[in-house]
UniProtKB/Swiss-Prot annotation:
GO molecular function, one term: metal ion binding
Protein name (record): Peptide deformylase
One Pfam family recorded for the sequence: Pep_deformylase
InterPro entries, sorted: Peptide_deformylase, Peptide_deformylase_sf
Cofactor entry: Fe(2+)
Role summary: Removes the formyl group from the N-terminal Met of newly synthesized proteins. Requires at least a dipeptide for an efficient rate of reaction. N-terminal L-methionine is a prerequisite for activity but the enzyme has broad specificity at other positions.
Residues annotated as binding Fe cation: 105, 147, 151
Organism lineage: Bacteria, Pseudomonadati, Bacteroidota, Flavobacteriia, Flavobacteriales
N-terminal signal peptide: none
Record key words, sorted: Hydrolase, Iron, Metal-binding, Protein biosynthesis
Catalytic activity from the UniProt record: N-terminal N-formyl-L-methionyl-[peptide] + H2O = N-terminal L-methionyl-[peptide] + formate
EC numbers for this chain: 3.5.1.88
Keyword Zinc-finger: no
Active site per database record: 148
Length: 196
């Protein structure tokens, strides 16, 4: 089932999410619904807060980035094979010199800005079968994980922008929160005027 994606301005996107356990109600159904929702919106990642749930879970499938001609074959292969669910993740290390990449977000449609992040991460997490993993990622794979991880920390990519950039997109963000935007996927807007 396709769920509505929560738009910029909803408080759930600014809350630090809570861990879940194996008994979380209808977890398998939620995971399947989130995959459907992400693919329906042509996303490469989706975090539980983006569907209104302040829990520490996200999923990624960065395969569309593998079409980038500038990437080497090894990085393309990583991106093609990286369809994963991350439950209760913790980034335990971020290293390397920060680099910029134009990021977007399903909760903030039609806004893309350069965000600086470190290129290498080590992350601990449980998969959907509750197997524990500790893995290291680099480049675009790391960036997609960092972006989704920020969601469960209550951080949006717009929070990482300079004050000037924030001022330049302020009215665009206000319009998104009010639902004054056309999107091809289902969304829930926190400040939309209710019809009488």
């Amino acid at each position: 089932m396709i769920l509505p994606i929560i738009a910029y301005g909803d408080p759930v996107l600014k809350k630090k999410a809570k861990d879940i356990d194996k008994d979380y109600p209808k977890l398998e159904e939620l995971i399947n619904n989130m995959w459907d929702t992400m693919y329906n919106a042509y996303g490469v990642g989706l975090a539980a807060p983006q569907v209104g749930l302040p829990v520490r879970m996200f999923m990624i499938d960065p395969a569309p980035f593998a079409d980038d001609e500038e990437l080497d074959e090894a990085e393309k292969k990583v991106l093609m094979d990286l369809r994963k669910v991350f439950i209760n993740p913790q980034i335990i290390e971020e290293t390397g010199e920060e680099w910029a990449f134009s990021e977007g977000c399903l909760s903030i449609p039609e806004v893309r800005e350069d965000v600086f992040r470190q290129p290498d991460i080590t992350i601990e997490y449980h998969d959907e079968n509750w197997e524990k993993h500790t893995e290291t990622y680099s480049g675009l794979a790391a960036r997609v994980i960092q972006h989704e991880y920020d969601h469960i920390e209550g951080i949006l990519f717009t929070d990482k922008l300079s004050s000037l950039k924030k001022r330049l997109i302020k009215s665009k963000l206000a319009n998104i929160s009010k639902g004054k935007i056309n999107v091809e996927y289902k969304m829930r807007f926190p400040n939309a005027k209710k019809a009488r």
